[in-house]
Amino acid sequence: DTVEIVNVSYDPTRELYQAYNTLFEKHWEEQTGQKVRIIQSHGGSGKQALEVANGLDADVVTLALEGDIKTISDSRLIDPGFTSEFPDDSAPYTSTIVFLVRKGNPKQIKDWDDLLRSDVSVITPNPKTSGGARWNYLAAWYYFEGRGESEEDITEHMKTLIQCFH
């Protein structure tokens, strides 16, 4: 018998999960002898959260924002205190931020400080409307915080960075 798993996720993860699910299905069968088929459901993160909260049967849910997971939590499908299981009451998710630069990296962009320079433009979605862009914003904030900068200095860096967004 083949086991079916429904993975409800947000749009930008479609291709990632297509590749990952194929590898996982093969791995699972090799390890257990059991066949598994993963069914994907993709859409906007907020829409997917509402679908699950309103009854879409999901075995795995991966969404862009903690608020979307909270929508599911509010419907009592997961423990309302789920964030308390993680450091700093954080969302259980990671995201890797990559800087794509012109061929040869003519401006020698290496880290977040370089994105603050006046000769650099940043292309990213708007953090007010995009879950992925919020991760970008948080990654930048964490970078500056990790260097021990004050909240005031970090806020100024973030204002400068947002002005660079296109």
Sequence positions of predicted segments:
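Solvent-exposed amphipathic alpha-helical surface segments
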Residues: 27-31, 143, 147, 151
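Short, surface-exposed, polar/charged, turn-prone segments marking secondary-structure boundaries
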Residues: 33-38, 65-70, 88-93, 126-129, ...
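A conserved helix-loop-strand patch within extracytoplasmic ligand-binding domains
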Residues: 73-146
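Ligand-binding pocket segment of bilobal, Venus flytrap-like solute-binding proteins
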Residues: 147-166
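Early extracytoplasmic/lumenal segment of secretory-pathway proteins
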Residues: 1-75, 85-86
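Soluble non-cytosolic domains of exported or imported proteins
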Residues: 14-18, 63, 106, 127-134, ...
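Short, flexible loop segments at the rims of nucleotide/cofactor-binding pockets, characterized by
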Residues: 39, 101, 163-166
